């Protein structure tokens, strides 16, 4: 047995010497003693290719490239393997999770964390870490017993030891872990005659675990020879660049001393890898204490980009240049990264440039539709059919592929179930999914067309099919008692879903279309699913388990599944992480994401045991554990060194100034260090570079068109653009091959976010030959013409959800107050507390079940909200009683509707107006309350409007003047026109236009001592004071509040008197009768103007800004109009807010008879 060590810095020919040595032995004796090359898992494929592709060898029966685990299997084939079943990573995790749940009550520190999936994962990692470093439960238990330590640390180690011990007992004589298998491999080494004849080479490693050192020790002891290759200069200084591999060398020296074998060291000092002085100087001087600066010859570049996306786009362009102009092949190029955010960018950007690549990393299967379907199916059962997992299940499209346009059907179903609040076993109620119910989707019911009916029938059929499958799954699972039963039931359910056939069909189609990677994913998904089921049966077998626990454990297993993709072609760019990727002797290596915080990367302890606890354990127990954070931090420079010395021709470093979440980023200090080694190594700012060299952006036809679009956009905005872009446009335009898609891009150049004025015919087609509308529709137009166009022209509707909206609350209050008012004939004065509560309960029992499909009885929260609504109504009735006590006006009519042609005698007639185009305007609506007071054959009327929002319970006369608030004047106009239908006298005059705010008032107190219950009740009632505008006629003033006297301000209406008996300006909101009539007539003119603009086809995105507020804040159509408050201020309309509206209206010359009796 001999031991060799090839030592040297990167690129000095160590691996080449090894490969040459192996090659010579193979040529000399192709069937001689075995030669074993041990390498990291991610390097084995590359090394195998090197032997296969060597024209002098064309493969070999003598040499094998193996990692430690595969080597153990090779020995087991010879001497016999263990009898126990080997646990996969997923099986180990599932077993530990189940143990944690069973032992939860015995845990001291982690009892509350035990229920979380992530805890068992951390615990599994910790146990595997202990196994790698040969730490047993006995080690932990004896250490805890012998040492005094902090209570938290002791409790932590006791918890871990408890689970570790239980795990070891469960697997004893029945199962074996990967780490235990390696220990068994060590025990088998002396029996292997094959190993005794073998020459062993170990290359590509920079550190080993304790169990791996024990394997190396066995190889040295029993193999014919062992040669280990290490990237180190032999310096054992713990602060040396080569600390990590030198630590390996120190361990090997200890092993050799223990075995009494000398190490034959061979030092490699001559640099062979690098083709130029730049890379040689970079390697030699990176860790130099005294810098020797030389001129850079252009083989090293540092790129600075604004964003990560721009960074990868630039790398892609430079790869195209490498291939096209420098005659490289894709396989000559590698990209190394460290920030995981780049993996997504590679997948999204490199295909746009048609660059073949392979990312050497495992991807989780979690987000694949099949896995999402299975996990959603599990959650549906666990959550008792809650809506979110159900919708996720449906949207995977795995169970609905047989339906044409299944995604559209699922969208319709989602709209319906969100509106109806379908959850739990309501999914099974066929009556809820009657096709006729779909006609009520949204706010207005309509008769279904034949196409709509057919579509909704398909929706119902799709729902039934999926429900049948879920019910079958639930039934099968509910009948199971043991883990084996559950696994069998699950597999049979998948067969009932026809999932195997479906997946195999999909795989074959993908293969036929050349999408082999996606086809491979399908295979791995199915095989992974079967493996988890097999693991469950293997680990738990006939062990009884609840369905809930089984589904939890099963989900844990699914979490562990990962795609392991082999390269789809040989000629492709290799992409990997700087820490793990094994790329050697590439012509060009790109190191992306070279930012501070990534390289070097702050290393923080993520295991259950902290760094301090590790150090204490190592010192006191005399064992070695995985490196602590501070040790790993010291090795960051070595990681950078290894990554940048993989190239033999060129190295390009790149970094961005902004992270994936928009955060600022700094350049890596290693780049500053590298830059200091050269005289002419400047950082290239990518945007500035392209500005000077626009042709550098024109590397790929498709991407050049996109960049051309940006350049032409700048040119149209009168910015200076290089002539080469105009030349590029002409070349692309004149080429049949290149011009594809150019017309679409050019049309986008002239796109402006402006609407088009509708023609007369189209306006009539959209809005009809007469306008039948509520007041709020006209107010909406005044807020923004586009809002009106979107809602009433395009008829866009928001998705209705099963939740209480603000307008629902308003409707409830209106309905309840109408119900009670009619029961008492508007005589609120007669109410006492008992009567108020009785009537409130009656009204709520009658009305609440009709709201949103009985929404207010659907949950504890909504039932609580119902009680809150009841309390508000009771307080409101108390306020109405108080107001009625001191007012001569009597409520007479409630929720009175009006329209052009009344349907009943109780409805009022609305006068028809006409637009400038001759289009009739028919206004409809409903007046909450009409109060009347008659004196001397003259009737005065008050309009009372209930508002549940404080912001809308104010009459702003400026808004009235400009047509932004049209409701109250319209209502008063309608009442004045309908004196006969209302049973009023010949002379009818306006009294007040008043808002009543239905709310839950609050009063602030400085201390409890300030509270007087009687006064508190009075103060709360006063919070309901009416607001609006009152006729200044003395008769009206006297009737509104009988308590009015000099120096008194009413607490029920907006009227107050000075000490001389005149109306106070501060406490009164009044106008004379003529002014009110002028407001009414001006309001009509606003109707006509607004309706005329609508029929003229105005659809501008032009919100009206008033008092620094925009209607956009509460608009549902911003995603359609794309108005931006930061850049679209020129679109805003404004009005003169400084006017005195009463003076302004008085100055208008209006000739009108103020309507007439209809």
UniProtKB/Swiss-Prot annotation:
Domain UvrD-like helicase C-terminal residue range list? 269-583
Q: How is the cofactor bound?
A: Binds 1 [4Fe-4S] cluster.
Protein residues bound to ATP: 8-15
Sequence positions that bind [4Fe-4S] cluster? 784, 1112, 1115, 1121
Fetch the InterPro entries from UniProt.
Answer: ADDB_N, DNA_helicase_suAddB, DNA_helicase_UvrD-like_C, P-loop_NTPase, PDDEXK-like_dom_sf, PDDEXK_AddAB-type
Task: Report the residue ranges that make up the UvrD-like helicase ATP-binding domain in this protein.
Answer: 1-275
What UniProt keywords apply to this chain's record, in alphabetical order?
4Fe-4S, ATP-binding, DNA damage, DNA repair, DNA-binding, Exonuclease, Helicase, Hydrolase, Iron, Iron-sulfur, Metal-binding, Nuclease, Nucleotide-binding
Gene Ontology BP terms: double-strand break repair via homologous recombination
SUPFAM superfamilies assigned: P-loop containing nucleoside triphosphate hydrolases (SSF52540)
Any one GO MF term held by the record is: 4 iron, 4 sulfur cluster binding
Q: Pfam families recorded for this chain?
A: ADDB_N, PDDEXK_1
User: EC number(s) in its UniProt entry?
Assistant: 3.1.-.-
* Cofactor section: Mg(2+); [4Fe-4S] cluster
Reply yes or no: does the keyword Cell division apply: no
What is known about its subunit structure? Heterodimer of AddA and AddB.
Please tell me what else the database record remarks about this protein: Despite having conserved helicase domains, this subunit does not have helicase activity.
Role summary: The heterodimer acts as both an ATP-dependent DNA helicase and an ATP-dependent, dual-direction single-stranded exonuclease. Recognizes the chi site generating a DNA molecule suitable for the initiation of homologous recombination. The AddB subunit has 5' -> 3' nuclease activity but not helicase activity.
Q: Which family does it belong to?
A: Belongs to the helicase family. AddB/RexB type 1 subfamily.
UniProt-recorded name of the protein: ATP-dependent helicase/deoxyribonuclease subunit B
Q: What is the source species?
A: Staphylococcus aureus (strain MRSA252)
Q: What is the lineage of its organism?
A: Bacteria, Bacillati, Bacillota, Bacilli, Bacillales
């Amino acid at each position: 047995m001999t031991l060799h060590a090839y030592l040297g810095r990167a690129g000095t020919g160590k691996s080449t010497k090894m490969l040459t040595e192996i090659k010579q032995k193979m040529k000399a004796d192709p069937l001689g003693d075995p030669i074993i090359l041990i390498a990291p898992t991610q390097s084995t494929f590359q090394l195998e290719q090197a032997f296969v592709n060597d024209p002098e060898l064309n493969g070999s029966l003598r040499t094998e490239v193996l990692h430690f685990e595969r080597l153990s299997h090779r020995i087991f084939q010879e001497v016999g393997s263990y009898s126990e079943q080997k646990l996969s990573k997923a099986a180990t995790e599932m077993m530990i999770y189940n143990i944690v749940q069973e032992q939860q009550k015995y845990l001291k520190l982690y009892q509350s964390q035990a229920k979380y999936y992530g805890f068992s994962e951390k615990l599994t990692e910790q146990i595997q870490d202990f196994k790698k470093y040969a730490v047993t439960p006995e080690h932990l238990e004896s250490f805890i017993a012998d040492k005094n330590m902090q209570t938290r640390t002791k409790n932590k180690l006791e918890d871990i030891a408890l689970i570790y011990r239980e795990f070891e007992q469960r697997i004893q004589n029945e199962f074996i872990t990967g780490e235990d298998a390696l220990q068994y491999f060590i025990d088998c080494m002396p029996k292997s005659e094959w190993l005794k004849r073998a020459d062993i080479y170990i290359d590509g490693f920079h550190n080993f675990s304790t169990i791996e050192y024990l394997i190396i020790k066995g190889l040295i002891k029993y193999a014919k020879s062992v040669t280990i290759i290490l990237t180190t200069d032999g310096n054992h200084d713990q602060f040396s660049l080569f600390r990590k591999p030198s630590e390996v060398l120190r361990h090997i020296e200890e092993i050799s001393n223990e075995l009494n074998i000398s190490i034959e060291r061979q030092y490699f000092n001559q640099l062979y890898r690098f083709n130029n002085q730049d890379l040689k100087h970079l390697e030699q001087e990176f860790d130099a204490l005294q810098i020797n600066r030389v001129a850079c010859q252009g083989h090293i570049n540092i790129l600075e980009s604004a964003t990560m996306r721009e960074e990868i786009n630039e790398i892609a362009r430079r790869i195209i240049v490498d291939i096209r102009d420098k005659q490289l092949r894709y396989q000559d190029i590698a990209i190394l990264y460290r920030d995981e955010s780049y993996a997504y960018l590679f997948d999204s950007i490199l295909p746009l440039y048609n660059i073949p690549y392979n990312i050497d990393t495992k991807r989780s299967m979690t987000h694949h539709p099949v896995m999402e379907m299975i996990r959603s199916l599990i959650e549906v059962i666990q959550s008792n059919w809650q809506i979110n997992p159900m919708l996720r299940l449906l949207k995977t499209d795995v169970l609905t592929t047989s339906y044409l346009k299944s995604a559209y059907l699922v969208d319709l179903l989602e709209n319906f179930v969100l509106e109806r609040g379908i959850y739990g076993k309501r999914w099974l109620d066929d009556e809820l999914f009657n096709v006729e119910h779909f006609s009520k989707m949204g706010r207005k019911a309509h008769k279904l067309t034949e196409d709509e009916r057919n579509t909704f029938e398909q929706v119902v059929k799709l729902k039934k099919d999926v429900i049948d499958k879920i019910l079958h799954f639930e039934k099968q699972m509910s009948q199971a008692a043991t883990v084996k039963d559950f696994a069998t039931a699950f597999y049979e359910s998948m067969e009932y879903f026809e999932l195997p056939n479906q997946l195999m069909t999909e795989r074959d189609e993908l293969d036929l279309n050349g999408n082999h990677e996606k086809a491979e994913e399908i295979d791995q998904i199915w095989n992974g699913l079967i493996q988890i089921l097999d693991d469950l049966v293997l680990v738990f077998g006939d062990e009884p388990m609840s369905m809930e626990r089984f589904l939890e454990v099963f989900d844990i297993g699914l979490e562990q599944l990962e795609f392991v993709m082999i390269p789809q072609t040989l000629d492709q760019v290799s992409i990997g992480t700087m820490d793990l990727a094994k790329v050697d002797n590439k012509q060009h290596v790109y190191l992306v994401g070279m930012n501070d915080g990534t390289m070097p990367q702050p290393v923080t302890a993520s295991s259950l045991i902290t760094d301090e606890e590790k150090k204490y354990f190592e010192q006191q127990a005399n064992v070695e554990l995985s490196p602590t954070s501070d040790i790993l931090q010291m090795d960051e420079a070595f990681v950078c060194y290894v990554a940048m010395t993989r190239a033999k021709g060129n190295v390009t470093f790149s970094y961005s100034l902004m992270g994936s979440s928009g955060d600022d980023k700094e350049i890596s200090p290693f780049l500053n260090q590298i830059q200091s080694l050269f005289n002419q190594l400047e950082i290239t700012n990518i945007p500035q570079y392209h500005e000077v060299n626009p042709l550098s952006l024109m590397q790929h036809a498709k991407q050049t068109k996109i960049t051309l679009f940006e350049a032409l956009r700048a040119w149209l905005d009168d910015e200076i653009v290089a002539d080469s872009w105009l030349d590029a446009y002409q070349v692309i335009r004149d080429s049949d091959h290149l011009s594809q898609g150019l017309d679409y891009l050019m049309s986008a150049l002239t796109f402006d976010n402006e609407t088009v004025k509708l023609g007369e015919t189209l306006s009539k087609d959209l809005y009809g030959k007469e306008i039948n509308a509520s007041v709020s529709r006209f107010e909406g137009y005044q807020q923004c013409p586009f809002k009106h166009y979107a809602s009433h022209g395009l008829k866009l509707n928001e998705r209705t959800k099963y939740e209480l909206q603000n307008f629902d609350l308003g409707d409830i209050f209106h309905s309840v107050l109408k119900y009670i008012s009619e029961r008492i004939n508007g005589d609120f004065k007669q109410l006492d507390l008992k009567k108020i509560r009785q009537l409130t309960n009656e009204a709520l029992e009658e009305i609440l079940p009709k709201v949103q499909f009985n929404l207010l009885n659907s949950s504890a929260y909504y039932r609580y909200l119902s009680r809150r609504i009841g309390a508000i109504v009771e307080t409101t009735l108390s306020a109405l009683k108080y107001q009625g006590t001191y007012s001569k006006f009597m409520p007479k009519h409630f929720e009175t509707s009006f329209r052009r042609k009344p349907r009943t005698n109780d409805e009022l007639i609305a006068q028809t107006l006409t637009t400038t185009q001759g289009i009739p305007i028919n206004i409809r609506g409903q007046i909450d309350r009409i109060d009347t007071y008659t004196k001397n054959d003259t009737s005065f009327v008050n309009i009372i409007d209930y508002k549940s929002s404080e912001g809308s319970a104010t009459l702003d006369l400026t808004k009235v003047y400009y047509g932004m608030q049209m409701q109250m004047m319209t209502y008063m106009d309608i009442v004045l026109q309908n004196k006969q239908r209302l049973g009023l006298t010949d002379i009818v005059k306006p009294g007040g236009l008043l808002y009543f705010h239905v709310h839950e008032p609050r009063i602030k107190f400085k201390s409890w001592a300030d509270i007087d219950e009687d006064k508190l009740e009075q103060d709360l009632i006063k919070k309901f004071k009416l607001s609006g505008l009152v006729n200044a006629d003395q008769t009206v003033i006297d009737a509104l509040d009988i308590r009015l006297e000099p120096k008194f301000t009413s607490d029920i209406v907006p009227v107050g008197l000075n000490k001389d008996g005149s109306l106070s300006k501060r406490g009164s909101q009044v106008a004379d009768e003529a002014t009110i009539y002028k407001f009414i007539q001006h309001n009509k003119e606003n109707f006509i103007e607004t309706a005329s603009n609508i029929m003229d086809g105005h659809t501008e995105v032009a919100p009206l800004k008033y008092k620094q507020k925009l209607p956009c804040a509460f608009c549902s159509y911003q995603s359609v109009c794309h108005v931006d408050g930061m850049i679209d201020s020129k679109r805003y309309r404004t009005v003169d807010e400084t006017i005195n509206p009463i003076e302004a209206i008085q100055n208008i010359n209006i000739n009108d008879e103020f309507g007439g009796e209809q």
